[in-house]
Structure formats: structure tokens, C-alpha cells
């Protein structure tokens, strides 16, 4: 274990490798645990939030002339991006945004399938179509992330590959928005998340869809897809440059146990760390040929158990907070017996989101109304209404795809 040295924040210099703070990282605006100071802004931020820190002299590189153009792959750069930024305000209610989001979502799935067809046929990826859809997706999520996140809960067994690409893009942009990334960075993240798995097109379909265990040779073929994705994106043009590292590194792990290069720690860029988390979350919560989908809380539990080992600890904590206890799209039963769908998360109180009521306490269709559990909703006896449990997809015949296709009409109660 390398020696660490305690140092007053007023003595910090550019090039010092900060490995520990005088308080929990989660209580500060710094995204990643441990980073090398690259600018005077990093120093000022540490001085604002800490009294002292611990540095590792063995990896510190003191430079009296700070780099005026910090490396965007280094944690310090991204910590500065997230400094003193709050999650943007929602500008469009979910019931309005979801209609437009559904159109964008359908276009995205269609566009990804066309891209996949082009790649298989050896044609160039349609850059303009990708750029248009990425821009529309980012704009929708910036207006209201819950609408697009709701759509990730809808599943089509016939389009698992394109669906995973689109879901990963949506979740990544929503995550980037949540931690305060500016729109220009959200678009770069979106490109990488959308294209991170295109190398799987070079893996035989019968292997990808094999319900049983893979042979050693088949595992090797599957594990080659990050390198295949990188090669495809490197030849696709400069617009796809931000996607190259994300595609190549999304199966790497913080402890070095991932593939294809066995990278660890700060060798992994922030975007690749983010997409690594989201890739696993979406795969776990989507039905696969080899297993049923898992409920979101099981996927979040897995991420939480492996934070600091396989996944970035700080990012996992933030991702779990963003997704919440009852993710958007969850079908829930309330303590008064009514059945509804979570349509808006509550970042300040994860246990009390907004719920679109679908069935009354007798499990019969009722007037569609939205109840805000955070506003002290009560039943007819004056008892607080809470979520009693989460139900499985399709329980009581609730079809969310049909609901969205028909257009959502409801009354907001409180």
C-alpha cells in the first residue's frame, strides 16, 4: 500500500495526486475518488470544501506551470465540470414530454437497426441520422428525464440488441444530466453509449442467442466485441471519436478484472466507468435468451455490492440515487390497495414518487389520476398512502406500451 501524506489545502500544487479527503467523497462535489490536480481551479475547489487532504507522493508529478488544457480523460477535469452544478430543472411535465419522447424513442430504435444493417452490409454508418437522433434524445432528457427513462422499461423481445443500445444511451444521458454534465458532454456520452456494442455484430447470432453456457472458444469470440466496436468506430469518422474509448473499455473493471485490456483505476475514463455501470444495469433488467429479467432493485443491489471493486464507488452511489427505490415505470400497489405506475421519481424522497393510478382497491379500472405521495397523500380514513410493494411487469393486465401508444390522459390530484 503506497504511503500517503496529509497536507493542508493551502499547500496544494498542480500535479499532486489526491487519494483521500478529510471527509467522505460523497459529501463533496468531486465525482471520482482520487484524482491528480490539473489546474488551479481544482486547488480552489479543494480549498473550498476541505481543510486538509492526503496525497500520494509516489504518483504525484509536481509541475510549476499548470496545464492550461487539462486532459479530458483525467478525473480532475470531470470533477471541475461537476463543481457546484445542480441537476437541471424539469421544464416539461412528464405527461407532455412522454408523447414527444415516444416518437424520438421509436426513431432511435429504427435508426439503430438501420445502422446495424449498414454495418453488416459493409456500408458506412449514416452520421447525419445518428447526429439528429442523439441531439433529439439529449434535448428530451434535458427537458424531463423521466419520460425517456419510462420508455426504457418497455421491452421488445425481437429487438434486444437495438433496444439495449437505445436504453444505454437514454440511461447514460439521464445519468450525465443528473450529475451536472453540460449538453456538449451529454452528446459525447450519448454517442458512446449508443454505439458501445456494435462490435457484437461480428459475433455469430447463434452464439449471442445461445440459451446455455458458452464454450471457451465462444467466450473468446464474445470478449472480442469491444475491440471490434473500437475498430468500427475508428473508421466511421471524427463524429464518432468520443465513442471509441467507451466502446473499447465498457467491460473493464476498477479492480483490473475486466477485458479486453485488464485496465484498472484511473486508467479508465469517467465516461467508460459510467457506461460500464449502465450496460450491466440494463442487461440485468432486460429479459435475455438465457434468463428472465431481474427487477431493478436486484440490479442495483448487485452494483452496490460491487462498488469499489468492479465499478466506481462514487458513480454507483450516484446512479443508485438517480434510479431510486421505485424506478420510473415500476408497477406498484399502494397501501390503500390501488394499483399504479411510477411516472416521476422524487430525488429528495425516493420512497414517495408520483404514481399514475390505474386500478382501484378492488383492482378495477379507475379514472386515471396522478397522486404525489410526497405531498402527504392520505386514504379515506386519513392514513398516509405509501407504496406497499412493487409488482411484476404485466401484473393485472397493465400494458404500459399500449398506454403510451394511446396517449396519456389523466388528472393531477396534488
PLM feature spans:
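Membrane-cytosol interface segments
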Residues: 1-125, 381, 387-414
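Histidine- and acidic-residue-rich, metal-dependent catalytic cores
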Residues: 98-414
Amino acid at each position: 500500500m503506497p504511503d500517503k501524506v496529509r497536507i493542508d489545502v493551502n499547500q496544494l500544487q498542480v500535479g499532486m495526486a489526491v487519494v483521500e479527503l478529510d471527509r467522505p467523497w460523497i459529501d463533496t462535489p468531486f465525482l471520482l475518488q482520487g484524482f491528480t490536480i490539473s489546474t488551479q481551479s481544482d486547488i480552489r475547489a479543494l480549498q473550498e470544501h476541505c481543510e486538509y487532504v492526503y496525497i500520494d507522493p509516489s504518483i504525484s508529478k509536481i509541475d510549476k506551470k499548470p496545464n492550461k488544457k487539462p486532459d479530458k480523460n483525467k478525473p480532475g477535469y470531470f470533477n471541475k465540470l461537476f463543481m457546484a452544478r445542480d441537476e437541471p430543472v424539469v421544464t416539461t411535465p412528464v405527461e407532455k414530454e412522454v408523447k414527444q419522447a415516444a416518437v424520438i424513442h421509436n426513431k432511435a430504435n429504427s435508426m439503430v437497426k438501420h445502422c446495424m444493417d449498414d454495418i453488416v452490409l459493409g456500408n458506412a454508418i449514416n452520421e447525419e441520422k445518428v447526429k439528429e437522433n442523439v441531439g433529439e434524445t439529449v434535448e428530451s432528457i434535458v427537458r424531463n428525464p423521466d419520460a425517456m427513462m419510462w420508455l426504457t422499461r418497455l421491452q421488445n423481445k425481437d429487438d434486444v440488441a437495438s433496444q439495449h443500445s437505445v436504453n444505454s444511451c437514454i440511461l447514460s444521458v439521464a445519468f450525465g444530466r443528473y450529475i451536472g454534465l453540460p449538453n456538449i458532454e451529454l452528446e459525447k456520452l450519448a454517442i458512446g453509449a449508443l454505439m458501445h456494442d456494435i462490435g457484437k455484430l461480428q459475433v455469430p447470432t447463434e452464439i449471442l442467442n445461445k440459451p446455455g453456457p458458452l464454450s471457451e472458444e465462444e467466450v473468446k469470440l464474445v470478449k472480442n466485441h469491444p475491440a471490434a466496436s473500437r475498430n468500427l468506430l475508428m473508421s466511421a469518422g471524427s463524429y464518432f471519436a468520443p465513442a471509441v474509448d467507451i466502446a473499447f473499455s465498457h467491460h473493464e473493471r476498477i479492480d483490473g478484472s475486466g477485458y479486453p485490456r485488464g485496465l484498472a483505476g484511473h486508467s479508465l475514463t469517467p465516461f467508460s466507468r459510467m457506461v460500464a455501470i449502465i450496460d450491466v444495469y440494463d442487461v440485468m433488467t432486460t429479459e435475455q435468451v438465457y434468463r428472465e429479467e431481474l427487477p431493478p432493485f436486484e440490479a442495483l443491489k448487485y452494483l452496490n455490492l460491487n462498488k469499489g471493486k468492479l465499478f466506481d464507488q462514487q458513480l454507483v452511489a450516484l446512479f443508485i440515487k438517480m434510479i431510486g427505490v421505485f424506478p420510473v415505470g415500476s408497477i406498484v400497489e399502494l397501501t390503500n390497495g390501488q394499483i399504479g405506475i411510477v411516472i416521476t421519481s422524487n430525488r429528495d424522497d425516493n420512497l414517495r414518487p408520483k404514481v399514475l393510478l390505474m386500478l382501484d382497491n378492488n383492482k378495477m379500472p379507475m379514472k386515471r389520476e396522478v397522486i404525489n405521495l410526497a405531498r402527504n397523500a392520505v386514504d379515506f380514513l386519513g392514513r398516509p398512502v405509501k407504496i406497499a410493494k412493487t409488482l411484476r411487469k404485466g401484473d393485472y393486465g397493465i400494458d404500459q406500451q399500449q398506454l403510451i401508444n394511446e396517449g396519456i390522459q389523466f388528472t393531477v390530484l396534488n
